């Protein structure tokens, strides 16, 4: 069985999130959660929350099946770019410079199959 969780409109660039997300792809869920919990990155906290949501989705949506969270694997983990918020900042000589505030969408798929 597979289950998916998506975190949308995360206020961090996809490039920064991808750095942390690549380290948990393909791991067992327990190992991935342990690695994310002790990571100092801001993205690690968001990825950990999304991973826990994917595990909860699998357990709660398949109540008839006996699913053990210990044997689950992270099958897919990827990040896509979300909408970019464009803001302006005052610059010298009466000008304005543009600020880009990128957002991201994180998708994590967990499975109990090999």
Model-assigned labels for residue ranges:
Residues 82-114:
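Strongly charged
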């Amino acid at each position: 069985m597979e289950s998916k969780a998506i975190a949308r409109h995360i206020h961090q660039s996809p490039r920064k999130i991808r750095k942390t997300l690549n380290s948990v792809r393909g791991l067992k869920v327990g190992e991935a959660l342990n690695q994310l919990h002790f990571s100092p990155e801001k993205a690690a906290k968001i990825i950990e929350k999304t991973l826990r949501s994917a595990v909860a989705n699998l357990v709660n949506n398949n109540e008839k099946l006996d699913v053990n969270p210990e044997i689950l694997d992270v099958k897919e983990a990827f990040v896509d770019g979300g909408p970019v918020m464009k803001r302006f900042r005052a610059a010298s000589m009466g000008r304005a410079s543009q600020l880009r505030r990128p957002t991201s969408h994180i998708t994590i798929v967990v499975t109990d199959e090999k």
